[in-house]
Design a protein with these regions (language model features):
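Unchanged
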Residues: 1-150
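Left-handed beta-helix
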Residues: 97, 105-226
Length: 226
């Protein structure tokens, strides 16, 4: 239980981000600034797949207005603004005891959303700070964005941006490296262990155990694990 934990700080994050994020600098800024809450954000245009009219039954996204000290003074919910925005990554650092207090307050009032219901109405009272992230970030909001963000990793600069820093550990399954059978053709692909390529494949990502049979032609695809 959160109440019984001994750690002083809590990190909260959504699960729809592909990002190589080191929390050390963010935590240091949080402590030095004396913030109640620190929220990571990235300067970018709002992805088309995220834009939608305000609807409390949908996932919400937020943009910020910050002052010169990095304090968040205004929080906008599901805006359709054009151009580069301070777009929240929905990654937060907060003291555990303060979070427990906020959760209790939210529960007693039937509140649901951390940003909309707890932070936005209290920006003058709370010290809420922004932490700018400058690295590679992929936001997965639907099937199309999942496909698009996977395909972007076929470019070296994007692949290096995600995996070039700290290592990212994934599920381990010992298997043979991808086998390229004589007569097969492969161009600009990423393939995991256990794949067998007998046919032709181009501009595609192959998950573990995928087999491209002889005579098959695959292009611009993401093929999932067997």
């Amino acid at each position: 239980m959160l109440k019984d934990a001994r750690e002083k700080y809590v990190v909260m994050s959504d699960a729809n981000l592909a990002v190589n994020f080191d929390f050390t600098a963010m935590l240091e800024q949080h402590i030095e600034s004396g913030a109640d809450v620190t929220i990571a954000y990235k300067k970018q245009e709002i992805p088309v797949g995220m834009k939608k009219p305000f609807d409390i039954t949908k996932d919400l996204y937020y943009t910020f207005e910050l002052d010169d000290d990095g304090r968040i003074r205004q929080l906008r919910i599901n805006p359709e603004d054009e151009g580069v925005q301070n777009l929240s990554m929905n990654i937060y650092i907060i003291e555990r005891e303060f979070l427990v207090h906020m959760i209790s307050e939210a529960y007693s009032k039937g509140m649901v959303y951390f940003d909309r219901d707890l932070l936005a109405p209290n920006l003058e009272r709370l010290n809420v700070r922004g932490f700018e992230f400058n690295g590679y970030l992929a936001r997965i909001s639907d099937i199309k964005s999942y496909f698009d963000e996977n395909m972007k990793l076929l470019k070296d600069e994007n692949l290096d941006g995600l995996f070039g820093g700290n290592p990212i550990y994934t599920k381990i399954r010992d298997d043979n490296p991808t086998r390229y059978i004589q007569g097969s053709k492969a161009k600009n692909i990423m393939s995991a262990d256990g794949c067998i390529i007998e046919g032709e494949v181009e501009n595609s990502i192959l998950f573990r155990g995928v087999r491209i049979a002889k005579g098959a032609k695959v292009k611009n695809c993401v093929l999932m694990q067997d």
